[in-house]
A protein has these predicted regions:
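Residue-level marker of positions within ordered structural domains that often coincide
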Residues: 65, 184, 191, 215, ...
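Short catalytic-site patches enriched in acidic/histidine residues
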Residues: 35-41, 140-146, 158-163, 170, ...
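Short, glycine- and charge-enriched coil/turn segments that flank and shape catalytic ligand pockets
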Residues: 19, 198-201
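A composition/biophysics-driven feature that prefers long, compositionally simple stretches
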Residues: 1-188
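Generic, well-ordered alpha-helical scaffold segments in large soluble proteins
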Residues: 182, 189-192, 196, 209, ...
């Protein structure tokens, strides 16, 4: 997706918040399955909507004071350990160039970040503990942090989650075109399955064929595939996908 689309969204969200405001949005955290193995990463939908960044350990900060608007992305500093195990982490210059964001700093530099003491805070309420930790690191008004911690600072707390979700309900021409592309890929994958599936196959084989078509067209699954044959088709969110397809069954 082109950067101009994300910039339009950021401009739109900042126009919807009050003046003298600080908006903070956190990326989704990585989820560990066991030991050092994580589940496949899934970015926060709202964070991705405003940035296009699909990496963990990133934070978007926007401030609004009259006509003065500032946008900062906080990212992880590249290191040799990540380079060996997961591949090179992008540098702040790479983020700045790729996503066209005004300022980019590393997470170990946040104590140097000056955001003032805005009277209105916008964030997703589910991230409150992350927020308190960040505000203390960036020397934001400690009284605000204390009130937030004790849940008494209601007048300046604004839920960013609902605000961004409302924005996402209305699709731009660019988004509508992307949705059509995704629908066309899905149609092609479904037609392919109608031609190829037969009794004796396993549901997971059908799933593999479906995913193969989607990935070959540059697509990703919006949710786990539901491949349900026979009585499994009565289960609304069936995802085991491990039964054999039998004759005369749907």
């Amino acid at each position: 997706m082109i950067n101009s689309e994300y910039k339009k969204r950021r401009a739109s969200v900042i126009s919807k918040i009050k003046d003298d405001a600080l908006m903070i949005l956190f990326s989704a955290s990585e989820k560990y399955r066991n030991n050092d193995v994580t589940y496949k990463y899934r970015q926060s939908s709202n964070f991705y909507y405003l940035t296009g960044v699909n990496d963990p350990s990133t934070i978007l900060i926007m401030s609004k004071n009259g006509r003065k608007i500032s946008t900062t992305l906080i990212c992880k500093r590249p290191n040799d350990l990540d380079k060996v195990w997961h591949g090179q982490v992008p540098s702040k210059d790479s983020y700045k160039k790729k996503y066209d964001i005004e300022y980019v700093i590393y997470s170990d530099e946040v104590d140097k970040l000056s955001v003032g003491n805005a009277s209105n805070l916008y964030y997703e309420f589910s991230d409150e503990y992350k927020l308190i930790d960040l505000l203390q690191k960036i020397n934001f008004d400690t009284e605000v942090s204390r009130y937030l911690k004790h849940n008494n600072f209601q007048s300046s707390k604004n839920d960013l989650y609902n605000l961004v979700c409302d924005m996402r309900r209305i699709k731009s021409d660019f988004e509508i075109n992307e949705i059509r592309k995704a629908a066309n890929v899905s149609v092609e994958a479904h037609i392919n399955l109608m031609k190829s599936c037969k009794p004796g196959m396993n549901e997971n084989e059908v799933e593999a064929d479906f995913v193969k078509i989607c990935k070959s067209k540059g697509g990703e699954q919006a949710y786990p595939a539901i491949v349900a044959s026979g009585k499994n088709a009565c289960i609304l969110h069936y995802t085991r996908n491990n039964s054999k397809l039998r004759s005369n069954q749907l």
